[in-house]
A protein has these predicted regions:
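C-terminal capping/lid segments that line or modulate ligand- or cofactor-binding pockets
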Residues: 34-94, 435-461, 599-600, 608-628, ...
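Extended ligand-binding clefts on enzyme/binding-domain cores
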Residues: 196, 210-242, 335, 339-343, ...
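Aromatic-rich carbohydrate-recognition surfaces in CAZymes
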Residues: 176-178, 201, 210, 307, ...
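Well-ordered alpha-helical scaffold segments within catalytic/enzyme domains
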Residues: 175-176, 327-336, 349-354, 393-407, ...
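C-terminal motif of bacterial Sec signal peptides marking the signal peptidase cleavage site
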Residues: 16-18
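Active-site acid/base region of carbohydrate-active enzymes
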Residues: 334-364, 413-435, 456-524, 547, ...
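An extended acidic
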Residues: 33-147, 217-243, 317-337, 343
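Acidic/polar, glycine-enriched structural segments that form the non-catalytic walls/loops
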Residues: 33-45, 152-155, 163-383, 472-473, ...
Length: 810
């Protein structure tokens, strides 16, 4: 790999007679301007985030030191920089805490003899990995992106990775002029301190720096920059001038005392037809301009080869290969995959990459802002770069499935930071439940009570104890300080008061179910509640608290006995050739599942009859061992759930085909009448609730995994009863595992949602089954895929709770 890259660099210099200087001391022709020229036009256009369908994310791998990230540990300096790639360009790049974006995008504009092209719109992009093994499996999150002009005039190749020894990102750029003379312009749109319109910008000494408060970003390059300017987006920035005048004449070097949505434009050397140029760009970060400049200088001085080798973990350096070598299940699970393990290796690293490095164990939902290119960046927002205990549980269990014993343990220990109690600022009320959504530092963001998010930490603690990762003494300690309050809340509920939420919770009635939208009795919520209580009962028994153990077991039994009475309709309005109107509801707002009562309006969708809405949450009852896969209530719900004759509004199941792949592959929406997705009238991003009734939630690959788990458990039970049937298991593997692999994009990122073919598709022209502009990669989806592989490899459902199964499945 190194030899090829060195050869490429040499050939680039030979092809371009004035090949750019690769040192960090390159000069720029615009440094001679003696007086600072202040850019007009503040604050510029309103700022937005970037397209959320990422084809790559990355950060440096760092080792824990005593359960934390420390500069004094084996990894040395902890690099707290994360990046993302979408539409062929660098998008949100974070520094500090994992949600603190500092960059909206960095892309190139190419001026040819007859046009000014925008890289992300006027090229065809491909994404691959810089380092793979002989089977093509990625060995690090270092990317190669090649963007080819749609008219064949030029090609831009870029390599992305971070510096493990600095707070910086490196991007190597190779530009090839194929059939025309071209001039590249680098365009940089900062979003310092996680907002897009409060930045100041300055140029000095070949450094382009943006600052907002205590955060700064500095761009440096080895390129001999011909001309540069800065300004306010859409008013005085360089690209706006190019579009208006065809040339860069302004030479603004500061925004002065005014702030806004700023952008840098760097004119690079012109390439004649047949010429190639290679340059390195570095984004450095810090608390001020001096720190960010020093970070960039350090990386440029270290150089491409050494930084990449360290990032990869080559030789003695600690990098991504070291992480992969710690996962003993990789080879076994690769044999179960249908792609040889490519998506598995990617998933393992993607899951690990979405952990904060200030608060070890804080795993977020996604390194993206859903529908970001339509979402305002005027105010700081985490998007999905936050902690949900439910998504968090999926990740921890997936890491455990990979054979990682460190990350799940540290994740479990982190959970005490997001548990309601006197440590949570502004909280008064009953302690024990886990906050709906928080920043990685524990700051509450959303504060609804979701009982499944309190059951899952109990399940995780139980599993870590049973697997020997937590000792008997340790689980007893955690029982007293974290698990007992959680279990008590699942039994007794109580008064909750934080921010807007002033409510008394009475389990198993939940204020919100797993889609965070409805209150009532939910099969999926009750499944996690029961499994959590059985886990708590086992732990309490071990800890010598027999009275509490009895209470937990008794409550679980009560909830199990009430389950069908509260959530199963025998008078449903969904019927078909096979359906008979008997099925689990998505949620029941009262104690009568047959009264056809209305549900609350959600995502602007009015649901006048709860029995019209079905989802796959009932399958969680089987996954966690609350019900048998052959239970008649489960079996009778499947026809309605799978009914593809329903109108699109109510329909949940869709089937997909992929070019060059034999067969059809199933997918499911969250539930009927789901409005969390693209606007059906124009194909644009999700519109906030009550603003549009045209939103449509699409198919989520998660549910292909959930169904694959159910089918495995069903096959296991039928095999136990009727004898072996290996052909059926192989068919399931080539249906559900393969489907999830096909839902991944070219960078092997698994999305939250894929296009289902319903509604206007003009905006993005998705192929059916292609990931949309919702959150990608979604940690939950990658976790579900990993767990599906582990389940099929083991021949039993990975998440299944043995104590729960022993109690309820006879």
């Amino acid at each position: 790999m190194k030899k090829n890259l060195i050869a490429l660099a040499i050939s680039s210099c030979l092809l371009l007679s004035a090949c750019s200087d690769q040192s960090s001391t390159s000069s720029s022709t615009n440094t001679s301007n003696p007086a600072a020229s202040i850019a007009p036009g503040a604050p510029g256009q309103s700022s937005l985030w970037a397209y959320a369908g990422k084809t790559g994310i990355g950060t440096s791998y760092e080792q824990y030191t005593n359960g934390a990230y420390s500069d004094a540990g084996a990894s040395g300096t902890i690099s707290k920089v994360w990046f993302s790639i979408a539409q062929g360009v660098l998008t949100e790049t974070m520094y500090g805490l994992i949600h603190e974006a500092q960059l909206q995008e960095l892309q190139f504009f190419i001026k040819s003899s007859d046009a000014l092209d925008e890289e992300k719109r006027d090229t065809i992009s491909t994404t691959s990995y810089l380092k793979t093994d002989a089977q093509g499996r990625p060995l690090s999150l270092a990317y190669k992106v090649v963007n080819k002009d749609k008219e064949g005039k030029y090609e831009i190749e870029k390599h992305f990775f971070t510096d493990p020894d600095s707070q910086s990102l490196m991007m190597r750029v190779i530009v090839r002029a194929l059939t025309d003379t071209i001039t590249p312009y680098a365009y940089v749109n900062p979003a310092i301190a996680n907002t897009g319109s409060n930045d100041s910008a300055a140029y000095s000494n070949n450094s382009w720096t943006a600052t907002d408060g205590n955060s700064s970003m500095t761009l440096k390059t080895s390129a001999a920059v011909v001309h540069s300017t800065l300004g306010f987006e859409g008013v005085s920035d360089g690209i706006t001038e190019l579009k208006q005048n065809g040339t860069l004449s302004n030479q603004y070097s500061t925004t002065g005392a005014t702030k806004g949505n700023v952008a840098f434009t760097l004119q690079l050397p012109t390439l004649k037809q047949g010429e190639t140029a290679q340059w390195d760009f570095v984004l450095g970060f810090g608390k001020n301009a001096a720190e960010s400049s020093a970070s960039a200088d350090k990386t440029l001085a270290t150089g491409y080869d050494k930084v990449l080798a360290h990032y990869n973990g080559d030789g003695d350096a600690i990098g991504w290969q070291d992480f992969l070598q710690k996962l003993p299940a990789l080879e076994k699970l690769s044999a179960t995959a249908t792609d040889g393990g490519k998506l598995l290796y990617t998933s393992a690293m993607v899951l690990k990459a979405q952990e904060d490095k200030t608060h070890a164990g804080a795993f977020i939902a996604s390194l993206s802002n859903p529908w970001g290119d339509t979402k305002s960046a005027e105010q700081s927002a985490t998007g999905y770069k936050a902690v949900w205990p439910r998504d968090f549980y999926q990740v921890a269990m997936a890491m455990l499935a990979l054979g990682d014993t460190e990350s799940p343990r540290i994740a479990f220990e982190y959970l005490q930071q997001v548990q309601a109690g006197d440590k949570i600022k502004g909280y008064t009320g009953t302690p024990g439940w886990f906050l709906q959504k928080t920043h990685v530092d524990g700051e509450p963001e959303w504060v609804g009570v979701q009982l499944d998010q309190t059951g899952m930490p109990l399940m995780l603690g139980w599993r870590l104890w049973k697997d020997g990762i937590l000792s008997d003494a340790e689980i007893s300690g955690w029982y007293k300080k974290m698990l007992k309050p959680a279990a008590d809340f699942l039994v007794n509920g109580g008064a909750v008061k934080i921010q807007w939420n002033d409510k008394t919770i009475t389990p198993p009635y939940t204020q919100q179910e797993r889609w965070e939208e409805q209150q009532g009795y939910s099969p999926s919520t009750i499944a996690a509640t029961i499994a959590g209580l059985i886990s708590a009962g086992d732990i309490a028994t071990h800890a010598g608290d027999t009275e509490s153990a009895k209470k937990y077991f008794s409550a679980a039994d009560k909830y199990s006995a009430q389950l069908e009475t509260l959530t199963y309709t025998t008078a449903g309005s969904l019927t078909g050739e096979q359906g008979n109107g008997n099925y689990y509801l998505r949620i029941n707002a009262n104690e009568d599942p047959n009264d056809h009562s209305a549900l609350g309006t959600s995502n602007a969708q009015i649901i006048s009859d709860e029995s019209q809405v079905i989802d796959g949450g009932f399958l969680e009852l089987v996954r966690y061992g609350v019900r048998s896969a052959t239970d008649k209530h489960i079996a009778e719900t499947l026809p309605e759930y799978d009914n593809q004759q329903l109108p699109d509004l109510l329909r949940v199941k869709y089937e997909f085909t992929f070019p060059g792949v034999e067969g059809t592959f199933p997918g499911w929406r969250r539930y009927g009448v789901d409005g969390y997705g693209e606007d059906q009238s124009n194909g644009l991003g999700y519109v906030e609730a009550n603003n549009s009734t045209q939103g449509r939630g699409r198919v989520w690959p998660i549910f292909t995994g959930e169904r694959g788990h159910y089918e495995l458990q069903l096959a296991h039970q039928l095999q136990s009863k009727n004898g072996s049937n290996k052909v059926d298991i192989e068919k399931l593997r080539n249906t559900y595992i393969k489907a999830m692999e096909l839902f991944a994009n070219e960078g092997m990122m698994l999305p939250e949602q894929v296009w289902d073919g319903v509604g206007n598709n003009d905006a993005y022209q998705y192929q059916k089954g292609e990931g949309t502009n919702a959150a990608t990669p979604l940690a939950w989806t990658h976790a579900e895929y990993v767990k599906l592989l582990r389940s099929y490899s083991d021949g039993k459902v990975w998440d299944r709770n043995a104590s729960t199964e022993a109690r309820y499945v006879k």
